[in-house]
């Protein structure tokens, strides 16, 4: 409004200026007052009175706070005192209780000490009683050689109204084995103790266990290792006697196991791989199966007591002169070395091949070697992976002749081999059979089988075995050196002509049977496909296979050498004439085989399927030439004949060449019937 008034008043009027001067003068006065007041305030703040007042106020406030905190602390301390008093009252109560606990502790300690003292006294008494028992047992007559520790002591038990103990049975059994001359033990109170004490005792023939069901026959040689059985034979003389028919079947396995252990001793030096399957065959499980087979095949009339057997031996069995163990071992070792020499080249060749393909061949090879060492079979193997050619137990025929010089020399060689087998059979004085259950079933048609209903008649086979040995002795001296020299010469010439065509899977030649390896290497056989049907199929289709036997050379793929062709030509002519005789003998054996157990036929069918599968496996790995010819030509079903003069591969030329010519078949039929 002043502006409006000023604007209204003209600038040149004196009132305006007067009013303006007044206002400015009042402004100056107010400013001075303000400055004075500020100076006074500053001075007051800088004075001591103000500072003292401020400190006083602060101290007063602090005093108030301290008084309040003191009050709070006093109340808190009062509470703490009350709590401590309560805790002290509890502690006093607990101290009174601990006194009672200490009293109980002392009482319990005294009781525990008393119990420990009583237990110590009882333990000393028990130890004294054990020592007294041992002293009493020693005074009662325990043998010093069979002294036992306290851990093996067993209390006496009452059995069948009599008081017995393990220690007394051990003493009785040890005294039973200390007889100065060879005896026969027919009671086994403890089989494990028998195994331990048999090494220091005399050699026994058999051990019959009298059980509640039947009288079974145990094999003597429980030792799996061949060295252990050989050491037993070196400690005591080996005796053998002419046994009766009922005893003979029980004792068939004894000599075979003894020879088998010695052959394992010689074979273990050549290859360690062959011992493990043979040990499995000699394991306790296989021996128990042997006992089951013996007990099932025997009848109630064959159950013999110990007294009956001893009386029967004294009456009708004069003892044979004992044979020194050293000579027996030397002859057996020599014969095993001569037999296993054909295997050296084949095993060396197969060692460089893959292990998968060697497994079936090694299995069949071990079965072949076991049959060589445990029976009197003449087995010739030229197989690779699965091929086994067997010619079981050929009998000698002095009147038989072959056309050609090579055939005559082969026949002489067979007679020499047969004589060695027969001599080893004569030393054992028993007809040996294969020890394993599978081998017994497989050779049931080749070995003499005694039915439960047959009467004991051992004179005829024993007499014929003697004639067999006598005829073989006549041929031994003159034939052995000549046949060895001729075969060495022929094989040396053949090795010189051998070409590079012969591969490791398809080449075929006769295996070397010489003991010396002077530059003569074994040839590698070809892969042949064999399928073995059962006996019933063989008899039904036997007459229709004559044409196949004559034309077998065109059906079997084989790489022939010159020496092999010469031997084949010399023998095929006579083989045709002998075919009809073989089928007649097969028909004659059908009636004999009809009485066999049904289980053997099932086993043969199983064996046929196994061999057929292995043959198909080996054919898949054969040479290209063999596979090509197998596609064009049908597979021949080779028959497995029943008697000893017919092997499983009767269609092969090698089997025809090595088989002796039997014109006198009546004696052989009587011998094995």
From Swiss-Prot:
Any one of the GO BP annotations: spindle organization
Biased composition (Polar residues): 196-207, 255-266
Localisation per UniProt entry: Cytoplasm, Cytoskeleton, Microtubule organizing center, Centrosome; Cytoplasm, Cytoskeleton, Cilium basal body
Single GO molecular function: protein kinase binding
Cytoplasm is among the record's keywords: yes
Phosphoserine modified-residue sites: 317, 321, 647, 650, 652
Mutagenesis or variant effect for residue 249 to A: Does not affect phosphorylation status
Low complexity bias spans: 503-512, 613-625
Region spans: Disordered: 175-207, 255-413, 432-480, 494-516, 613-673
Sorted UniProt keywords: Cell projection, Cytoplasm, Cytoskeleton, Phosphoprotein, Retinitis pigmentosa
Basic and acidic residues compositional bias, start-end: 267-293, 303-316, 331-357, 471-480
Posttranslational modification: Phosphorylation at Thr-379 by PLK1 is not needed for centrosomal localization or pericentriolar material expansion but is indispensable for spindle-pole stabilization.
Residues modified to Phosphothreonine: 379
GO cellular component terms given for this protein: cell projection; centrosome; cytoplasm
Family: Belongs to the kizuna family.
Connected disease: Retinitis pigmentosa 69: A retinal dystrophy belonging to the group of pigmentary retinopathies. Retinitis pigmentosa is characterized by retinal pigment deposits visible on fundus examination and primary loss of rod photoreceptor cells followed by secondary loss of cone photoreceptors. Patients typically have night vision blindness and loss of midperipheral visual field. As their condition progresses, they lose their far peripheral visual field and eventually central vision as well.
Assembly: Interacts with AKAP9, CEP72, ODF2, PCNT and TUBGCP2.
Other comment: Kizuna means 'bonds' in Japanese.
Task of the protein: Centrosomal protein required for establishing a robust mitotic centrosome architecture that can endure the forces that converge on the centrosomes during spindle formation. Required for stabilizing the expanded pericentriolar material around the centriole.
Protein name as catalogued: Centrosomal protein kizuna
Native organism: Homo sapiens (Human)
């Amino acid at each position: 409004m002043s502006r409006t008034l000023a604007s209204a008043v003209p600038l040149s009027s004196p009132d305006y200026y007067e009013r303006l001067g007044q206002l400015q003068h009042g402004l100056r006065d107010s400013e001075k007052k303000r400055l004075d007041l500020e100076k006074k305030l500053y001075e007051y703040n800088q004075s001591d009175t103000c500072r003292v007042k401020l400190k006083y106020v602060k101290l007063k406030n602090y005093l108030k706070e301290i008084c309040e905190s003191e009050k709070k602390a006093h109340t808190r301390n009062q509470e703490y005192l009350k709590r401590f008093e309560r805790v002290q009252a509890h502690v006093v109560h607990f101290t009174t209780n601990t006194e009672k606990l200490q009293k109980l502790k002392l009482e319990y300690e005294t009781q525990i000490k008393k119990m420990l003292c009583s237990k110590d006294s009882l333990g000393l008494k028990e130890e004294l009683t054990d020592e007294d028992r041992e002293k009493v047992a020693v005074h009662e007559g325990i043998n010093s050689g069979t002294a036992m520790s306290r851990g093996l002591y067993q209390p006496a038990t009452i059995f069948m109204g009599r008081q017995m103990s393990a220690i007394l049975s051990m003493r009785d059994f040890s005294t039973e084995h200390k007889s100065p001359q060879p005896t026969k033990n027919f009671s086994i109170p403890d089989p494990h103790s028998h195994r331990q004490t048999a090494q220091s005792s005399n050699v026994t023939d058999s051990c019959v266990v009298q059980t509640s069901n039947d009288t079974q026959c145990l094999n003597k040689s429980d030792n799996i290792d061949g060295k252990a059985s050989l050491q037993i034979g070196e400690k005591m003389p080996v005796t053998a006697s002419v046994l009766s028919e009922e005893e003979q079947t029980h004792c068939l396995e004894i000599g075979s196991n003894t020879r088998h252990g010695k052959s394992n001793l010689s074979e273990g030096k050549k290859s360690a791989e062959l011992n493990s399957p043979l040990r499995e065959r000699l394991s306790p499980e296989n021996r128990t199966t042997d006992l089951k087979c013996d007990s099932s095949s025997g009848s109630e009339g064959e159950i013999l007591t110990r007294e009956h057997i001893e009386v029967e031996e004294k009456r009708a069995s004069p003892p044979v002169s004992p044979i020194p163990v050293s000579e027996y071992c030397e002859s057996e070792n020599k014969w095993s070395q001569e037999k296993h020499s054909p295997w050296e080249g084949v095993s060396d060749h197969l060692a460089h091949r893959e292990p998968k393909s060697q497994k079936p061949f090694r299995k069949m090879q071990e079965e072949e070697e076991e049959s060589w060492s445990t029976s009197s079979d003449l087995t010739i193997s030229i197989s690779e992976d699965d091929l086994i050619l067997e010619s079981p137990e050929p009998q000698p025929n002095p009147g038989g002749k072959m056309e050609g010089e090579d055939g005559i020399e082969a026949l002489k060689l067979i007679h020499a081999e047969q004589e060695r087998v027969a001599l080893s059979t004569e030393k054992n004085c028993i007809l040996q059979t294969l020890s394993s259950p599978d081998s017994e079933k497989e050779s049931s048609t080749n070995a003499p089988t005694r039915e439960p209903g047959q009467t004991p008649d051992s004179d005829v086979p024993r007499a014929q075995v003697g004639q067999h040995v006598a005829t073989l002795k006549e041929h031994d001296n003159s034939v052995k050196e000549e046949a060895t020299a001729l075969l060495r010469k022929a094989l040396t010439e053949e090795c010189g002509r051998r070409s590079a065509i012969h591969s490791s899977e398809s080449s075929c030649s006769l295996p070397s049977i010489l003991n010396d390896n002077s530059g003569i290497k074994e040839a590698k056989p070809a892969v042949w496909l064999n399928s073995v049907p059962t006996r019933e199929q063989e008899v039904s289709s036997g007459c229709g296979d004559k044409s196949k036997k004559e034309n077998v050379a065109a059906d079997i793929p084989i790489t022939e050498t010159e020496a092999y062709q010469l031997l084949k030509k010399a023998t095929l002519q006579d083989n045709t004439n002998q075919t009809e005789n073989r089928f007649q003998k097969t028909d004659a054996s059908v009636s004999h085989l009809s009485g066999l157990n049904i289980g053997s036929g099932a086993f043969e069918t199983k064996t046929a399927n196994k061999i057929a599968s292995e043959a198909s496996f080996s054919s898949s790995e054969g040479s290209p030439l063999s596979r090509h010819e197998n596609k064009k030509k049908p597979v021949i079903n080779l028959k497995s004949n029943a008697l000893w003069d017919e092997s499983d591969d009767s269609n092969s030329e090698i089997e025809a060449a090595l088989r002796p010519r039997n014109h006198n078949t009546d004696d052989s039929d009587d011998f094995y019937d």
